[in-house]
């Protein structure tokens, strides 16, 4: 099985609305690996790794997010395996500190 890895930047009203927790919980439930964090510019950044179809579905869900969020834009880029190293040891999916 080939692993697809995508870096996702989500802009809009996505901080202070539970977006990171929602993304981590939803991604883990789908069997994805990766991480999510707030950025100082008000966006949320995530790394999603797993089967291509599952990653694509998660990216689609990111365009809506939790009910309190208002997503204006989702930017998706390819990422390398080394980006997964930002996760905390022993975790499949981590909520990282703000960058």
From Swiss-Prot:
It comes from the Bacteria. Disulfide bonds: none annotated. GO terms for molecular function: acylphosphatase activity. The keyword Hydrolase applies. It catalyses: an acyl phosphate + H2O = a carboxylate + phosphate + H(+). It holds the Pfam family Acylphosphatase. Transmembrane segments: none annotated. Gene3D superfamilies: 3.30.70.100. Belongs to the acylphosphatase family. This is Acylphosphatase. It comes from Rhodopseudomonas palustris (strain BisB5). The gene is acyP.
């Amino acid at each position: 099985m080939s692993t697809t890895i995508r870096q996702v930047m989500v802009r809009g009203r996505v901080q202070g609305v539970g977006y990171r927790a929602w993304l981590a919980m939803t991604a883990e439930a789908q069997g994805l690996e990766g991480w999510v964090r707030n950025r100082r510019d008000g966006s949320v950044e995530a790394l999603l790794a797993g089967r291509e179809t599952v990653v694509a579905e998660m990216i689609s869900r990111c365009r809506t997010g939790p009910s309190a969020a208002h997503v204006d834009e989702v930017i998706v880029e390819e990422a390398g395996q080394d980006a997964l190293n930002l996760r905390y040891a022993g975790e499949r999916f981590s909520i990282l500190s703000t960058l």
